[in-house]
């Protein structure tokens, strides 16, 4: 017995088939688009350049005199605020060192305009000036502590000298700053003008790291004093479990970089816009 279909039923069958074909084509096309998007994003991430800006001591313009005049570790508070405001207005987002570590390992994609802010030594001015500015802007930073000079009790700030952070102040800044190691007591120069880290034996470097750990806890992130290191230094840090280490150089961080030879821009030497204009 032959089945008879009405015109309406036939139209419904054709419509259903058409919809199925369209859905299949759309699914396939979407898959291609997603693959293209994923490839494009991967390419962008592979090419992404992350500036790491290095600061030290902040001093108000009115107090830049004496030992702070033409001092290569000093930037004025006013200039620092101006630079941070400029970054914010241009859409830059600060990232943590853990994010940078995952980015280098290919495990995380970063925002288009990512940047890392670092401060060496652990000056009290970081607490007095940098901390409230970054807090106000919703920015994150890293302080590489010279653990041998961290104070047991908070010190009175004065522009007539240099004071360092206390452990109490370090704890208070945890909402804005994370902390790495700038050695415990190897922030010195040899007679030839090189960082003493370059002359230290692996045993001495490891012992210095252990002193830092006893004071600040685990050390995953490290900054070479004066930017100086040797292959032996790097081998020691790797054995000791350090994940990222920073030196000085006019280059941005990108995938493929050695995580123990990452470059920081010394912001005493460069203008912010000069740094940003080098991003490709």
Residue ranges and their predicted role:
Residues 139-144, 242-248:
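Short hydrophobic/aromatic-enriched beta-strand-loop microsegments
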Residues 93, 178, 243-244, 261:
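Conserved beta-strand segments of alpha/beta enzyme cores
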Residues 120-121:
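Noncatalytic alpha-helical scaffolds and linker/capping helices
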């Amino acid at each position: 017995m032959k089945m008879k279909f009405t015109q309406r039923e036939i139209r419904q069958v054709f419509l259903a088939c058409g919809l199925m074909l369209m859905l299949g084509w759309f699914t396939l096309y979407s898959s291609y688009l997603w693959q293209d998007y994923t490839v494009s994003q991967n390419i962008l991430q592979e090419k992404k350049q992350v500036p790491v800006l290095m600061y030290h001591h902040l001093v108000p313009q009115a107090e830049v005199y004496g030992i702070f005049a033409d001092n290569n570790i000093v930037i004025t508070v006013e200039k620092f605020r101006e630079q941070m405001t400029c970054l914010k207005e241009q859409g830059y987002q600060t990232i943590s060192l853990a994010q940078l570590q995952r980015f280098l390992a290919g495990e995380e994609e970063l925002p288009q305009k990512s940047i890392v802010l670092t401060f060496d030594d652990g000056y009290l001015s970081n607490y007095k000036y940098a901390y409230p500015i970054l807090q106000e802007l919703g920015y994150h930073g890293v302080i590489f502590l010279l653990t041998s000079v961290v104070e047991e009790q908070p010190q009175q700030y004065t522009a007539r000298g240099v004071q360092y952070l206390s452990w109490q102040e370090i704890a208070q800044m945890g909402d804005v700053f994370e902390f790495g190691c700038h050695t415990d007591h190897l922030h010195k120069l040899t007679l030839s003008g090189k960082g003493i880290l370059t002359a230290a034996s692996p045993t001495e470097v490891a012992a210095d790291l252990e002193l830092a750990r006893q004071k600040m806890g685990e050390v995953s992130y490290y900054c070479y004093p004066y930017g100086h290191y040797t292959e032996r230094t790097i081998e020691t840090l790797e054995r000791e479990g350090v994940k990222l280490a920073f030196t000085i150089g006019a280059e941005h961080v990108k995938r493929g970089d050695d995580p123990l030879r990452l470059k920081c821009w010394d912001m005493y030497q460069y203008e912010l816009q000069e740094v940003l204009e080098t991003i490709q």
